[in-house]
Swiss-Prot record:
Gene name in the database record: lptD
Alphabetical list of PANTHER family matching this protein: LPS-ASSEMBLY PROTEIN, LPS-ASSEMBLY PROTEIN LPTD
Main location: membrane
UniProt protein name: LPS-assembly protein LptD
Keyword Signal (UniProt): yes
Role description: Together with LptE, is involved in the assembly of lipopolysaccharide (LPS) at the surface of the outer membrane.
Organism annotation: Marinobacter nauticus (strain ATCC 700491 / DSM 11845 / VT8) (Marinobacter aquaeolei)
Length: 794
């Protein structure tokens, strides 16, 4: 028998496959849909001024507003998504209702439906109890966990949870992806199928860019979308067409084309266009194939493969061009085939054990400057190949590795090429015995180089064993420390092709060191900020009785350390193991720190020190490294952090004999709290190397949306610019654009140029390579990029 309710009371129903329960309750909720219907995005969009302060504070300044998801439950609480929708009862309410037993329920006026995490509102609804199908007339609004849908009418299955909407709009809150469609099917909680649809991450009414397609499927569970017959539109004008694409809607990986990369470089003879294709082969390995056309050179391909295991990650990168026409023209006799390979691996085995490997090889010395765009190979004269394992424990460490090089420029003489270590084994350990501390540092190396065309010491290869046992008496207190120690620096050689005597010989150097420091502090204040000021004097004495003439020993891996403040507390002025410096010297140094007692931050540190030599240093490395000075240059360091966003670092070597600065390095770094403003000012000076350069870099917002980017490097000795970078960046809340012009110095001391672009569509990634070059040039830019886009959340 039909039943109906026509008063202003609300009929509220709880429906299941077994029974229908009807209850009456008062309703004070306004019906949706009067007048023109807002889209899903318009419903949840809030201007910046209407957002909660904590949400607005997370928005970038170039965003005018953001989305605030509404509540799912009618009582203001989000309905938990427990269970399968079809197994949960349907709750319904309306201003009027007519019910036919075991047949149909008709609802009219402010209809509200809820089944588990699914909720919808509309003007009218018909529910067929036999089939479980529900027809809803709009304007309707459907809300669930992380999404909002609107439309003119819909069909909903209470058994499967599928919702089909005509003339629909939608919003995915997590990715801020919105759109519209002639029809939309919510197949499941996480899957949406769209016909004749449009999607974008721009705000409501702002279709700066959009993807328009005949069919679009969004899978939130998998994190990607697929589309057919796709147009990329900019300001409603089509600019690109794909018959089929897949695209990410979150940070997860998905096989498909990435966005094109393009730019211009005089090194590449003009413009280039790249179309990367990403292969998500398995959860633990993937690959990226990047074919690219370079004007003047031809088709060039780069491939990157990544493999992730329970122990670590391995990356293989390849570059190949079959026929580089520009290279062939510049190098008669070459066929134009060029290639490069770079492999890196890192592994952690547990228990303190780890492994690593690096291998790089290129076809010719100009490859890196002409072609390299993505391989992680630095421009260098020698490419290192190294692989080994290491162990770090509480009181000991061990490492063994193989190490070799590819010398890139053919013009480098054989005598200047580095030796390979095949292998090198390092062991060190320490133990405490009462007041004493015993330690050992040891190293075994087999050195090899192709010396067939060399003579004398340069022709030698062979083995070297070095061991330094030490016995120390460390004494520590809150007010200071003292550490006297004695050690023996022992080296044994077994050489091949050695012509100056017995090929097996050793060297023993007795060493005494005594390091002492005191600590004083006092409380003070500056501008009503309490500080703790320290005064830390330090005395370090070193004595090493090394034989003065060690030039009968080949130079396998030895160099002379650059003298800086930290060198004040090293007894040996040589790196490597083929020379042990003689020493009889005393270092006097003083450090003072200013620590903010409110935050614990070190606001200032100043250090100064000098070495007093009691004897001439006679050990040299084939004419370099010996000296008869009685005092070293005065070495100083200054670090200032007056505020969290400003830092000044400066180091200085001043020669009291010549009263001139030997070396100086200074860098001033500033960034605003949100990293929108970046500024660096650097100066480097070296009198021995005849080097003086000034470096200025900045990212400066011209408006909330437009920023200027620049860097300039000037060499005073060459009296010329040696590097520039200038560009503009535009940001709004749905896309950004960068254009950068860069000059850089090549090996032949000529300025090369390149023009780089980058376009990023929020939520879909970017194309172009400008950002990487800016990050390499300007300190803090990586952090700025990380913060550039923000999503409001409650």
């Amino acid at each position: 028998m039909p039943s109906h309710c026509s008063s202003l009371l609300c009929a509220r129903f709880r429906l299941s496959s077994l029974a229908v329960i009807v209850a009456l309750a008062a309703s004070g909720v306004r019906a949706e849909g009067a007048g023109s219907s807002p889209s899903a995005a318009e419903i949840d969009w809030r201007p910046r001024s209407e957002l909660p302060p904590e949400v607005a504070g997370r928005l970038p300044v170039f965003c005018e507003g953001g989305y605030l998801p509404g509540t799912v439950g009618g009582d203001g609480a989000v309905v938990p998504g427990e269970g399968i929708e079809g197994s949960m009862p349907l709750e319904a309410s309306a201003l009027n209702a007519r019910y036919e037993l075991d047949s149909e329920l008709y609802l009219q006026g402010d209809v509200r439906l809820r089944q588990g995490p699914f909720q919808a509102t509309g003007a009218e609804a018909r529910y067929n109890q036999q089939s479980g199908e529900l027809q809803l007339q709009g304007p309707l609004v459907s809300r669930g966990e992380g999404f909002l849908l609107t439309g003119q009418d819909a069909n909903y299955s209470t058994q499967s949870g599928q919702l089909d909407i005509n003339t629909a709009t939608f919003l995915l809150h997590e990715s801020e992806l919105r759109g519209e469609a002639s029809s939309l099917s919510r197949v499941s909680e996480s899957q949406v199928v769209i016909s004749d649809g449009m999607i974008t991450t721009c705000g409501p009414g702002q279709n700066d860019w959009s993807i328009v397609a005949s069919d679009i499927e969004l899978d939130q569970a998998e994190g990607f979308g697929t589309a057919r017959h796709v147009r990329l539109e900019v300001l409603d004008a089509p600019v690109f067409y794909w018959p089929y694409i897949t695209f990410p809607i979150d940070d997860r990986r998905k096989t498909g084309f990435l966005y094109p990369q393009f730019g211009s470089s005089s090194a590449g003879s003009g413009a280039y266009l790249a179309l990367p294709y990403y292969l998500n082969l398995a959860p633990h390995y993937d690959a990226t194939l990047t074919p690219q056309y370079i004007h003047g050179r031809g088709l060039f391909t780069e491939v990157e493969g990544r493999y992730l295991s329970q122990y670590g990650e391995s990356v293989l990168q390849l570059g190949y061009i079959d026929n580089d026409s520009a290279f062939r023209d510049e190098n008669p006799g070459e066929n134009g085939e060029r290639w490069a390979l770079d492999f890196t691996t890192r592994a952690a085995f547990g228990g303190g054990w780890s492994g690593y490997g690096d291998y790089s090889v290129i076809s010719d010395e100009d490859y890196l400057s002409d072609l390299n765009r993505s391989l992680e190979i630095d421009q260098a004269t020698h490419l290192q190949r190294r692989g080994g394992v290491r162990y770090y424990g509480a009181n000991q460490y061990f490492e063994t590795y193989l190490n070799g090089y590819q010398t890139i420029p053919d013009r480098i003489a054989d005598v200047d090429k580095p030796y390979a270590q095949l292998p090198e084994v390092i062991y060190g350990g320490s133990l405490e015995a009462g007041w004493l501390e015993a330690s050992l540092e040891s190293q075994y190396t087999w050195f090899y180089r192709d010396n067939e065309n060399l003579t004398g010491l340069d022709k030698a290869n062979g083995q070297r064993l070095r061991a330094i046992p030490e016995l120390a008496l460390p004494m520590r207190a809150l007010w200071g420390f003292s550490r006297p120690s004695v050690s023996l620096d022992y080296t044994r050689y077994e050489l091949d092709d050695y012509t100056l005597g017995d090929a097996g010989f050793d060297r023993t150097v007795p060493v005494f060191e005594w390091d002492n420091g005191l600590y004083f502090d006092r409380r003070s204040s500056l501008f009503d900020v309490p500080y703790n000021q320290t005064l830390e004097p330090r005395l370090y004495y070193a004595w090493a009785d090394a034989e003065s003439d060690q030039n009968y020993i080949p130079d396998f891996d030895t160099g002379i350390r650059s003298f800086r403040f930290d060198q004040l507390f090293r007894r040996d002025r040589f790196t490597g193991g083929d020379r042990v410096g003689d020493a009889n010297q005393l270092t006097v140094a003083l450090t003072s720190r200013f620590n903010d007692l409110l935050t614990g931050a070190e606001r200032a540190r100043v250090s100064v020190g000098q070495v007093r030599y009691f004897e001439d240093r006679e050990v040299d490395l084939f004419g370099e490294g010996a000296s008869d000075r009685s005092r070293s240059p005065l070495a100083g360091e200054l670090v200032l952090n007056p505020i969290d966003n400003l830092e000044l670092r400066s180091s200085l070597l001043w020669d009291h004999e010549t009263r001139k600065t030997e070396e100086g390095r200074s860098q001033l770094i500033f960034h605003s709290e949100d990293y929108r403003y970046l500024a660096t000012l650097g100066h480097t000076y070296s009198r021995p190397d005849e080097l003086e350069q000034t470096d200025i870099g900045t990212v400066f917002p011209v408006t909330d949306q437009v920023s200027a980017i620049g860097r300039w490097v000037w060499d005073s000795e060459l009296d010329r610019t040696v590097g520039t970078l200038a560009g503009l960046e535009y940001n709004n809340c749905c896309w950004s654009f960068q254009v950068v012009h860069q000059n850089y110095l090549t090996d032949d001391e000529e300025l090369d140029t390149r023009l780089l672009f980058r376009i990023e569509l929020k939520g879909l990634g970017g194309s172009g390579g400008a950002s990487d070059n800016i990050a390499d040039a300007i300190y803090g830019y990586d952090e700025r990029e990380r913060r550039r886009f923000g999503n409001p959340r409650r």
